[in-house]
Amino acid sequence: MAIKMRLQRFGVHKRPFYRVVASESKNARDGKFLEILGTYDTILDIVELDHNKAQKWLSNGAQPTKTVKKVFKKSKFVAKNKTKFEK
């Protein structure tokens, strides 16, 4: 099963708020997830990310989406070992 690190949309109309989650790639965007890794507020540009959890999922083979890679850069997340994320 392929694990993706992606965003789940929350909030109200024209006021989105996202959770960074690890979920199976077959699940819907706002569907079932395995673990919450952090939050991202696009309006206030605030990123709260648990770096230890993100590192754990990357080392287990989870693939971040393009948007989650950008969120990682905003939160100054650096992977400890070489993973596919850095390539």
Swiss-Prot record:
GO terms under biological process: translation
Pfam families hit by this protein: Ribosomal_S16 (PF00886)
Key words, A-Z: Ribonucleoprotein, Ribosomal protein
Gene Ontology MF terms in the entry: structural constituent of ribosome
Manganese recorded as keyword: no
Gene Ontology annotations for the cellular component aspect, listed alphabetically: cytoplasm; small ribosomal subunit
Family per similarity comment: Belongs to the bacterial ribosomal protein bS16 family.
NCBIfam families found in the cross-reference section: S16
The protein's name in its UniProt record: Small ribosomal subunit protein bS16
Organism the protein comes from: Aster yellows witches'-broom phytoplasma (strain AYWB)
High-level lineage: Bacteria, Bacillati, Mycoplasmatota, Mollicutes, Acholeplasmatales
Gene that specifies this protein: rpsP
